């Protein structure tokens, strides 16, 4: 039996990988799980042809993970519809819609969502969006279920005793231009934690994508100029790829006494581990805001959100 897993960018960073791993573990009798890579230029007919070429029996098509673009979502919906037409069971598990993928307008091909045997989403915002699209069934909210992974403590031996401040902050000129004028407010919100050793908790490979290592390093340097980060090898891309995993990141988060982030995965791991979180939301930073709202009843004591206006365009 074959299970086809449809994701947007399944291996781009630890956040997407954590969702894929959780989904694979959660599928009963999954058989052989194949992560499908769709040609962005393929037509609906060509997508149906892809389904026909996969060795039978294809028993299940699963839509999962964080989708960022409307095109990738509509392609995946078209592929899922072809799978259903070929007799496969359709499941939506831990789906998250962000940015363009979560736009108000109902996407092409959304009718297949009403054929899902299971309709389960990662967060409340995605559930609200699906409801706005007029689906016949109400989605179930799983509330970042990948946060419950068993931590891997392999990297903890390299950390010093005492309280540690964990940071994971999205990089980019616009982001830094927004938070840097508010550094005194951030330091005040941290209180004594501003003087603790700093552990980077970035989810992207250094130098790739949103590069939250650059953002993390910039904030750490503003808080404690000249102070080296803990586990400096994580700032090297090959070392990071070799050393880190979702389970190891969760262990690092759990070792912190406070986590500062605008990333949803470190925040969700912190909530699961009982570590307070200072969320930094630049303007409408949906990922951290959605995470806080979805897990509002579980936030550890001392957690809070600091809203930061977006810097004016240069």
Cite the ranges covered by each PLM segment.
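Active-site anion-handling motifs in enzyme catalytic cores
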Residues: 1-314
């Amino acid at each position: 039996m074959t299970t086809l897993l449809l994701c947007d960018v399944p291996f781009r960073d630890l956040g997407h990988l954590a969702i894929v791993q959780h989904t694979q573990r959660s599928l009963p009798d999954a058989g052989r799980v194949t992560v499908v890579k769709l040609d962005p230029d393929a037509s609906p007919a060509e997508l149906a042809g892809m389904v026909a070429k996969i060795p039978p029996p294809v028993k299940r098509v699963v839509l999962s993970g964080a989708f960022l673009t409307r095109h990738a979502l509509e392609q995946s919906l078209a592929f899922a519809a072809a799978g259903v037409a070929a007799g496969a069971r359709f499941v939506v598990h831990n789906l998250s819609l962000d940015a363009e993928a979560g736009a108000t307008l109902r996407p092409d091909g959304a009718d297949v969502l009403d054929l899902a045997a299971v309709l389960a989403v990662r967060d409340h915002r995605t559930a609200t969006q699906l409801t706005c699209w007029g689906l016949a069934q109400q989605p179930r909210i799983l509330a970042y279920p990948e946060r419950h992974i068993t931590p891997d403590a392999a990297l903890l031996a390299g950390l010093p005793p005492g309280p540690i401040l964990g940071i994971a902050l999205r990089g980019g000129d616009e982001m830094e231009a927004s938070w840097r004028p508010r550094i005194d407010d951030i330091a005040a919100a941290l209180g004594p934690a501003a003087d603790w050793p700093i552990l980077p908790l970035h989810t992207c490979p250094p130098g790739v994508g949103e590069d939250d290592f650059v953002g993390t390093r910039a904030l750490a340097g503003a808080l404690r100029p000249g102070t080296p980060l803990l586990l400096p090898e994580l700032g090297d891309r090959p070392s990071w790829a070799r050393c880190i995993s979702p389970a190891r990141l969760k262990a690092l988060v759990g070792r912190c006494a406070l986590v500062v982030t605008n990333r949803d995965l470190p925040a969700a791991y912190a909530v699961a581990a009982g570590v307070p979180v200072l969320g930094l939301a630049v303007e409408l930073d949906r990922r951290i805001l959605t995470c806080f709202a979805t897990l509002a009843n579980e936030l550890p004591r001392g957690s809070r959100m600091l809203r930061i206006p977006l810097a004016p365009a240069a």
